[in-house]
């Protein structure tokens, strides 16, 4: 019994740390993009909004492009594989990567985003 009392006293003597809450992004997690041109604007808005509110996580162009790549599937994922294999500079250029996506997946030039 003495051991228990000592243990309880020792535990009670420990400083109480406030629970650290993990920050949760208020923007819904972006859906995947498979190369459907009609869904490209929606994909860009979803991923851009998600990254915008979490600037600490997405602090560089490389991290932003990497995140976009994780949301690609099907033909869109197949499209990006050669860029990864040759370590394309576009992987470190968020705006350049978006411009290339728009070009490849048929974004009309007069549409500004």
From Swiss-Prot:
Pfam families (UniProt xref): DUF4939
Other facts: RTL8C is one of at least 11 genes called Mar or Mart related to long terminal repeat retrotransposons. They do not correspond to functional retrotransposons, but rather to neofunctionalized retrotransposons genes.
Gene it is expressed from: RTL8C
Name of the featured protein: Retrotransposon Gag-like protein 8C
InterPro entries named among the record's database cross-references: DUF4939
Family to which the UniProt record says this protein belongs: Belongs to the FAM127 family.
